[in-house]
Amino acid sequence: MLKPGGHVAVSVWDSPERSVGMGALYAAIRAHGSMDVGLPAGPNFFLFSSAEPSTEALRATGFESPTFRQVPQVWRHLDPDQLFAMMATGTVRAAATLRAQTPRATQAIREAVREAISAHRRGDEYEVPMPAVVAAAVKP
């Protein structure tokens, strides 16, 4: 229960164009696998990655003075396959979508993600832009 004057904050990944790892993963699934794998319908994963729907949702639920900002972050990996492994084991919906692919599709998805991540090699590391966004507001 949030008291009057209390603050709420919600964070989600930024859009797939800016959150390169998420964008690469979902582009690879669409290109080499299937998003239709029998999971229950869910909202658009990136629905709240932009200011308007985020602040409107906060206002619609009774909050005031909504703000929205990007939180820059970079994931650093030593191996271009680390991002795929993290998504396959450290997420919920993306991992379930990956587990439901055929072995051939999974391999093609892994290779496509590796290729996308390889473009972000900096010396001995891969620096993958993975910004999030935070929407916040105040309970009247």
Description of each model-found segment:
Residues 6-7, 91:
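Gly/Ser/Thr-rich helix-start
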